Amino acid sequence: MSDEQGWYLMQQYQEQVEELYGQAELIERLVNEYHRTVETVQELSDIPSQDTLIPIGGSTFVYGTLKDTGKVLVNAGRGILVEKPVNAAIDTLNKKIEELKKSQESILKTAEEIKGKMDELAQKMSEKDVQIPQKED
C-alpha cells in the first residue's frame, strides 16, 4: 500500500467512525424521548379526566380534554396506530427502548472495530515513517 493509499484509507475510517458516532447519538436521543414518553404515559394514567393544552406544532397549542387516560395509541409501524391499555403500551415502549439500545451497542462496537483498524494502520504507517496530515476543521 502506498503512503497516499494509507492516508486515504485512514481518512475513510475516520469518516466512518464519525458517521457511526452520529448514529449512536441520534439513537440516544430517541431512547431519551421514549423514556420521557413512558413517564408521561404513567403520569397521565393516574388522571381520570383533565383539561389540557395540546401542542399542534410551531409552539402553538389548542385546548383539549383528556377523556380516557387508561388507553393510549401506540405506533405499530407503517403509520398504523394500535390502541393499548397503559401497561401494555409501556411494555411496548420499553421493548422499543431495548431494541434501540441493542442497535446503539452494535453501532458503537463497529466504531470501535474501525478505530482498531485505524490504530493498526497508523502503526504500520509510523513504521514506514509516513507523516499523516492532520484533518483541518
Protein language model regions, located:
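Intrinsically disordered, low-complexity regulatory regions in eukaryotic proteins
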Residues: 1-76, 80-137
